[in-house]
From Swiss-Prot:
Entry protein name: Protein kinase C and casein kinase substrate in neurons protein 2
UniProt free text on domains: The F-BAR domain forms a coiled coil and mediates membrane-binding and membrane tubulation. Autoinhibition of these functions is mediated by an interaction between the SH3 and F-BAR domains. The F-Bar domain also mediates the binding to the cell actin cytoskeleton through the interaction with CAV-1.
Subunit structure: Interacts with adam13 through the SH3 domains.
Residue ranges of domain F-BAR in the record: 11-282
Taxonomic source organism: Xenopus laevis (African clawed frog)
Amino acid sequence: MSGTYDDSVGVEVSSDSFWEVGNYKRTVKRIDDGHRLCNDLMNCIHERARIEKVYAQQLTEWAKRWKQLVERGPQYGTVEKAWHNLMTEAEKVSELHLEVKNALMNEDFEKIKNWQKEAFHKQMMGGFKETKEADDGFRKAQKPWAKKLKEVEAAKKSYHAACKEEKLATSRETNSKADPAMNPEQLKKLQDKVEKSKQDSQKTKEKYEKSLKDLDGTTPQYMENMEQVFEQCQQFEDKRLSFFREVLLEVEKHLDLSNVESYASIYRELEYAIKSADAMEDLKWFRNNHGPGMSMNWPQFEDWSADLNRTLSRREKKKPTDGVTLTGISQSGEQSSIQNQHSSHLSVQSAQSTNNPFEDEEETVSINETENKKIENVGSYEKTHPAEWSDDESNNPFNPSDTNGDNNPFDEDALTTLEVRVRALYDYDGQELDELSFKAGEELTKIEDEDEQGWCKGRLEGGQVGLYPANYVESVQ
């Protein structure tokens, strides 16, 4: 991100105001935060799309299983037809949720990804071009004023020191007059010292006043230049805020599938909440709390006070707030250099990858001959025994784990490739049953190439096969 401004070294900060030396960095950091927020929003949509896919699969499996049970059961007539319509409804809802999943990934996710790529341009040395341009603009605008401010601080310090010395010399002269042992020569030296200290005080005072006047003369131009760079940053943030609002409204439209009043009211409230977002209001808040709208304790002439043993520095009056350090993924020792080069980007990416896993290989589910026999047995059993509901999948004869993938409407062609040895760059804990877990530095075998969602299939040393994020490993040389 932004570097430390050289000319600000030694300048004491008296407040948290935007106008203080170096306090523009919060505005520069907001640009980097915008890139991270794009990743956060993409992962949020990614995870919701996965939920939609899993729910659609469960509805299809449920409808297929219960169609067979009702057909072979004792129910008949219009009630049987009505019962069948319940499964037909599930199939249609399943299709709708698959459409939602596709819309979220193919439209909303891709739209954010493309906008982020167009808005932020990475540099070879790390960071983003937009961040560096803003930082350079602020530093250039602040450099002349910061230099004058350092001169004011130095002049004030010299003046206050001279005043203190004058006070001490005057006190010694007064005490010496009351001392009968003090000879005229010594008294004359003290008087000369008092006179010299008064002259020094006057000179340093004049220099202090002159440097302060020079600073006041450069302040209007300083404010104008800083305001100009800040407005450029505001325009960039305005585009991001407006884009996020637009994307959120599109996501809301894709999610709103229900005509039931209770669901409709939820989506009305969601739409109202999103449409209540106002980019201009956000920009106004940032301006008043972190920008030119903040109050400023402009430097003024401060006379020396005899009651003070020392002068409070600008830093002692109010220390600036410490920055916030983002922490991310753990890594092996041999990858520390890579992490240092890309710490800002990787810390965000890794945290999001861990918390928002998503894979698009479809789980295959169908009913084989063995399950058909189970269905027949259950159907005949339920004709003579009352049914008892249980959520325990281990006792469910129609558990999806007993099925194969011959007739699964969600099945996709698997990607094949030669087996390649890879090494984990970071720790990863699988979030689903079909995902692998490993530690940084651990080696495994990649058995399928990366899919369109960024996942690979691999095999651990113990033989376990599953999915893992492609950017969590590197090829073993």
